């Protein structure tokens, strides 16, 4: 690809240093597997509470009344949004203050604290616990993803498959966690009618502590990657960041308390500000880097739409499963929580298949924008199936067949495989070298905006009196048309985005 020689280009910025030579395991740097297990346990903790949050809010704070479904969905969306929005600050702390390794360790410790606080059955402590998890995850999540990218050179052909393996760690934790925590909550310490949600939160806290210890023991494998600069290795900066976390928790608590609509304004302002910072840095580095940043920001916008509808999985789909899906198999009832594992099982099963398809496609392998477009379209197909089930398959008891929601999760998973692993790798290739952490933060912030919108949308699906067949059908019909339109537009503008990416694959 020719470059305008009359203008400064990204070549003016020194390329990132080559990673050290690592011993390999199964063809990849050995530290990848340490990061894999660290992320596995963090996702175990995260997804352990995911299935329980909206059900717990309705049961604990609304005495089980269906009118609590809409507020629960909005709280869930706001919490997820803030989890991902906090990544932009975590990226900054790692880039400029603490280094990636110590950011991960501090974040894990703060997250574990928040998970144990959630177990206290008080509304204020519940939201303080959520706020603490948000702050800790902001330090942890973007930086462990960035560490994966730092194990490979930009041109390393193993890079994308390395991110896919890392993504498998995410999904293994997410698969096991709902099953195990549901058994603890309903079979060991509670009943189907009265689950012990406290045990869900406690088990998740223990999982987070395991993640912390695993990374602490294994970080020597990284050979200095992500370590703080020589002038930033003292304990003083760690204490400064811990004080910052303590000060940030009340701010996040306030944002949870003000509601999803106000939060949406805050998140939008943050996204615009971050986009400007990335664009200014891209312009400073030259025309090629500027174009790459523009391409990345366009894809971020479509990422918002994907997650707005995908994250119904943890909110409105949970109420759908609990109230409108026929989960009975003779004398046994399929637990609502276990639907959260379907996505992860599908990811683990289908990820090698999707990867094989991309390899075999050769020159017909879709570009990054078209893969994102496919992700949107598959997400839309899932909503089309829901439309069909709610309009044509409702039985006399007002229930839809089990297989319909099961397949919705599977189809959404195919869409996720087209989009999310590619997105993580894309950011490390397109973001300005000096602001890769901010680039990851932008990816997670766009996901967070989508998550907050998902909570608002879930509230509309549930309605003021709780979810009904008619309210679900109306909401999911809108979801189908929105996703179909977004996917079609992205396919149409894909050639323009490819041009802006200057050969990045």
Q: What is the meaning of each model-derived region?
A:
Residues 40, 114, 125-140, 300, ...:
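Hydrophobic core of transmembrane alpha-helices in multi-pass small-molecule transporters
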Residues 268-278, 332-362, 375-383:
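Transmembrane alpha-helices of Major Facilitator/SLC transporters
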Residues 51-73, 186, 313-337:
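Short amphipathic helix-loop junctions that connect adjacent transmembrane helices
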Residues 106-127, 377-397:
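C-terminal ends and interior cores of transmembrane alpha-helices
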Residues 73-94, 141, 175-177, 341-354, ...:
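Central cavity-lining transmembrane alpha-helices of secondary-active solute carriers
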Residues 158-186, 200-211, 245, 340-347, ...:
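Glycine-rich segments within core transmembrane alpha-helices of 12-TM secondary carriers
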Residues 1-28, 154, 185-318, 323-328, ...:
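Intracellular loop-helix junctions on the cytosolic face of multi-pass helical membrane proteins
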Residues 103-104, 372:
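Primarily marks hydrophobic transmembrane alpha-helices of the MFS/SLC 12-helix fold
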């Amino acid at each position: 690809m020719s470059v305008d020689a009359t203008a400064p280009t990204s070549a003016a910025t020194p390329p990132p240093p080559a990673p050290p030579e690592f011993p390999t395991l199964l063809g990849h740097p050995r530290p990848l597997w340490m990061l894999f297990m660290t992320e596995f346990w963090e996702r175990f903790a995260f997804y352990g509470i995911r299935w329980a949050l909206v059900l717990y809010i309705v049961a604990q704070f609304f005495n089980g009344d269906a009118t609590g479904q809409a507020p629960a969905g909005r709280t869930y969306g706001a919490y997820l949004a803030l989890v991902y929005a906090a990544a932009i600050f975590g990226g900054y702390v790692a880039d400029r203050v603490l280094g990636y390794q110590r950011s991960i360790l501090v974040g894990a410790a703060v997250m574990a604290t928040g998970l144990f606080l959630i177990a206290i059955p008080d509304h204020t402590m519940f939201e303080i616990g959520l706020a603490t998890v948000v702050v800790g995850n902001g330090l942890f999540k973007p930086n462990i993803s960035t560490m994966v990218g730092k194990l490979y050179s930009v041109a390393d052909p193993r890079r994308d498959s390395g991110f896919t393996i890392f993504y498998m760690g995410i999904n293994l934790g997410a698969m096991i966690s709902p099953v195990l925590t549901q058994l603890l909550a309903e079979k060991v310490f509670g009943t189907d009618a009265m689950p012990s949600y406290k045990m869900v939160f406690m088990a998740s806290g223990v999982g987070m502590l395991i993640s912390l210890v695993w990374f602490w023991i294994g970080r020597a494998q990284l050979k200095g990657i992500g370590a703080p600069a020589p002038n930033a290795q003292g304990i003083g900066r760690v204490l400064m960041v811990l004080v910052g976390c303590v000060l940030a928790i009340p701010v996040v608590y306030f944002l949870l308390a003000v509601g999803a609509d106000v939060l949406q304004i805050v998140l939008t302002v943050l996204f615009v500000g971050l986009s400007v910072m990335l664009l200014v840095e891209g312009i400073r580095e030259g025309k090629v880097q500027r174009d790459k940043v523009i391409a990345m920001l366009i894809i971020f916008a479509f990422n918002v739409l994907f997650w707005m509808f995908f994250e119904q999985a943890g909110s409105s789909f949970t109420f759908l499963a609990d109230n409108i899906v026929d989960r009975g198999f003779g004398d046994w009832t399929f637990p609502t929580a276990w639907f959260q594992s379907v996505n992860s099982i599908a990811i683990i099963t289908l990820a090698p298949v999707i990867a094989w398809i991309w390899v075999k496609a050769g020159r017909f392998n879709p570009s990054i924008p078209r893969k994102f477009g496919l992700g949107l379209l598959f997400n839309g197909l899932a909503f089309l199936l829901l439309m069909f089930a709610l309009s044509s398959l409702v039985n006399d008891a007002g229930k839809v067949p089990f297989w319909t929601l099961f397949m919705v999760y599977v189809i959404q998973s195919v869409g996720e495989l087209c989009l999310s692993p590619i997105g993580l790798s894309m950011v490390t290739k397109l973001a300005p070298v000096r602001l890769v952490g901010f680039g990851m933060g932008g990816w997670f912030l766009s996901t967070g905006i989508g998550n907050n919108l998902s909570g608002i949308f879930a509230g509309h699906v549930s309605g003021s009196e709780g979810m009904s067949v008619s309210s679900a059908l109306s909401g999911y019909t809108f979801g189908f048309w929105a996703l179909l339109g977004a996917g079609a537009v992205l396919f149409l503008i894909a050639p323009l985005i490819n041009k802006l990416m200057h050969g990045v694959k």
